[in-house]
Every structure is written in C-alpha cells, then in structure tokens.
Amino acid sequence: MMEGFGVHTFRLVNGKGDARFVKFHWKPLLGLHSVVWDEAQKISGKDPDFHRRDLWEAIEHGAYPEWEFGLQVVEEKDEHKFGFDLLDPTKLIPEELVPVKRVGKMTLNRNPDSFFAETEQVAFHPGHLVSGIDFSNDPLLQGRLFSYTDTQLIRLGGPNFHEIPINRPIAPVHNNQRDGHMRQAINDRRTSYQPNSLSGGCPMQAKADLGGFVSYAEKLGGAKVRQRSQSFFDHFSQAALFWHSQSEPEQTHIVKAFRFELGKLEVPAIRERMIGMLTRVDLTLAKRVAQGLGLNMPDKTPILFNLSVPADGNAAQYQPEPNKREPGRSPALSMATTLKDGIKTRKVAILAGDGVNDADLVGMQKALREAGAEAKIVAPRLGMLTSAKGAQVYIDFSFLTSSSVLFDAVYIPGGDGSAQTLEKEADAVEFVKEAYKHCKTIAATGAGDRFLRTTCLERDGSDRENDRNTEDEGLIIGHDGDARAVASKFINAMAQHRHWARELKAQPA
C-alpha cells in the first residue's frame, strides 16, 4: 500500500480564531510496500490494470483497505525553527521532529457502480475546505486555488462541476448562483440577489458563528515584489536527508534508477552535469552513479547550477544554498521500517500439476486463508488437475496467463508427478527464478523441494547443509507431511515482504 500526504501546508483555526500550521497524512494500516523497478516494467506488459484489479478484488472479498488520517501540527511561533521554509512545498517535516497524530480513519468499503460517474468525474480542489481549515501563504497553493477551478471548467464542461452527484457536498449549499452550463440544482425562489425583500432576505451571507468561511486574520507587512523567498533556494538538504535515511537495498535501487535514467541521455555533458549536482547531495551517491555511467567524478562542480534566471535578475541570487547541515536520518522515510506483522491481502501462487500432494495443497491453502492471504493455483494448462488421491482441483491460471510479478510469494507443494511436470515446464522454471530474483518468499515441501533447490540454488537437493541460511533468505523447505510447519514459517517470512540479502549474492541466470 501507499502513504498519502499533501505537499502544502494549511492552517487549522479553532473556534477562538487561534491558528496553527498543519500538514495532512494518510497512513496505510497494512504498512508501506512497493514493487521493484524490474517488476513494475513487466507488470505494465503482463497486466496494465494490475493495481486497480488488486484494489477491486480486495474490496470485493471484504478485505477493505484502510488508512488512518494524521496531522503534523506546528505552532505559528515555531514556523522558522526547522532550518527550512515550512511554506516550501518541496519540503517535508521529519516525523521525528513533529510526530504524526492520527485522528481518523478512511475505509474503502465499496467498489464503484459506474467508473465514469463515480471516478472519472471527480473534481478534486484544494479550495474545497471544511470549517476549521484555512490556507497558508504557500505561493504554489495560492496558484492552485485558481488553476484547479480553471481546470474543472474545461475538464467537466462548465462552472457547475461541483453539482455533479459525485462532487455534490453532503452539507446543503445556499447561494445566489444561477444558470451556467450543466446546471443541476433547481431553485424555486424568486430572487437571485442580496439583499432582497421578496424572499425574506434569503439566501444571505453566513457569518462565522453560522459556519461561514472567514479568512484567518493574519498581520502582514513588506514590499510587494515578484521573487521567491531566499529560504526556497535550499534544494539539497532534504535530498541528503532522504538518501541517508534509506536502507542499503533502497540506496542500491536509487543508484540503479539514476544509472538507468541518466544512461538514456545522449549528451555526455548533461550526464556529467547531473553527477556534479549529485555531489551536492552525497559524494558516495555521485560516485556510484558515475561508475555505472563510465564517468569520472568532476574535478569541480559548476559555479552556476540554476540558469533559469529572470531577464533582469542576478544569476548569483538564484543559486541553490550550500548544504551546511549534517544530513541526519529520518527512519520514517524508509520502507524498511514499515509494519511487518501480517500477510492480509497478499497473493500467493501455488505451482502444481497432476499428482500434487493433497495434504500439502489443502493444508497450505487453509493456512493462507486463515492468515488473510489469497492462494491461486498456477499450472501448465487451465481446467482441472487431478491430485495424488484423485481429487479434482480447479486451476486459476496457466503459466501463459500469469506471471510471478503478479504475486507476492510462491509455494511448490509435494507430489512426484506434480514436481516432474514442473521440472519439464520451462515457464515454471522461469516463474520461480523470477520470483527469486525479485527477493520474494518461496516455499516447497516434499518433491517440490528438489524443484526449488535446482531452480534457485543450483543444487540437486541431495544435501541440506544450508537449510537455515536459505530460511533467512526467504526460502522455506520442508519434507513430506511438513505442510503445517512450513506454512507457519512461510507466513512469517512473507510478512517481511522481501528478502534483500539475495541481491548481494550472484543469482543463477
């Protein structure tokens, strides 16, 4: 799942008119997880609707996604105590400095009946506020208050976009607005102006004590100029904070992402310039990226990083501020610290063929279901397969209609016939190898043990000298009849999401 958070700083205003700055957060109750880059690319080809389908199926099965609503509240007197501009939308407040206070919950408990009416026509707008919330002087937010209205005028056909059923407020609205394209409301009063006597003076402007909106009375002073605050030129301190807050695997993924993106540039000078910019974030990061691009570290960084300067501006005044502070760490910025206490909504691929061991299959399905996960049978063909005891088992996917990138973990049950079928199936071998490459949890019991070992460990299964090490790396191996014990270890390993230690080892091709 993903976190949600706004980039802008708003204000909370209480009944006495006292204001505090606030940043809003949505915290997923199942923790923060993601796919890796190679998976993301392959998912786009295998199932472009993967994430939407996953959300839909979870809701349909009653596993409702939940987020808790959190606030980071800052007193007005503390606006300048953080070393960065609180109104700069490119900055975040480390949760270690201002903890997120959770005050509510959102549950997605129903799928749309009509995607067009209920999702395509949604009009989000930062100016649609409830009582007690006001705007800050964030200049980007001020611009968006205009631009979002302008966008919906074109996107949804006119000024009455807020009257479309999905956008209509729950609280009743009374005003003097009439007509306009796509008008939904029908007004039965004679007047459309205020003051009036014909309609008893209604509707009339609501005062603050009646719930009307009143802008926060803030004292301001200064010259009216067209320029950014100097505090907005701190471009690197939080980039450094983010880099130093990541775990080793996350840092490696960031380096690879830079190597990929910059490797697509066809002008070497731009690559070199970007390496120079990364030195302002962290020298180690810059060196690792440069190594992957076949570049040497620059002898000196450019004097002028920012060349986007107004015609009458002084270029020196538009350069990023040097990062003079120690970057520090914020564990809240790393996915390595996320919640890892369950496997609800995870999808597990059970690879099987005719002759699959009944006890292994049924036992694992039961354990996964009780833990809140969903198990799917993947086989060389669709239809039904016959278990070792003659039971008919429905096949959810074939290897042609599925892929390991669409699952969170893989299980290979016992059964000599089933294991032999998988060993002869090139797509089955590729399925397991790819899951291993992406550091997913993989388990096997009985005859499935041999298939797992030869596929992932390049061993024939005759020795078990390193079983403990494989468990630490998310490979759970058991004997015939071990399904219950393996299931417990399998579920605990799945809760860790990925096993990044594998990335440090050479993997079979």
Task: Outline where the language-model segments fall.
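Charged, compositionally biased interaction regions
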Residues: 49, 53, 57-334, 340
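Hydrophobic cores of alpha-helical transmembrane segments in multi-pass integral membrane proteins
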Residues: 8-10, 104, 351
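ADP-ribose/adenylate-binding Rossmann-like module
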Residues: 438-445
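Internal mixed beta-strand/loop scaffold within catalytic domains of large alpha/beta enzymes
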Residues: 1-41, 49-50
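Short helix/loop capping segments that flank catalytic or ligand/cofactor-binding pockets
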Residues: 20-23, 32-35, 79-80, 114-118, ...
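Residues that flank catalytic or metal-binding motifs in active/ligand-binding sites
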Residues: 6-8, 22, 65, 102, ...
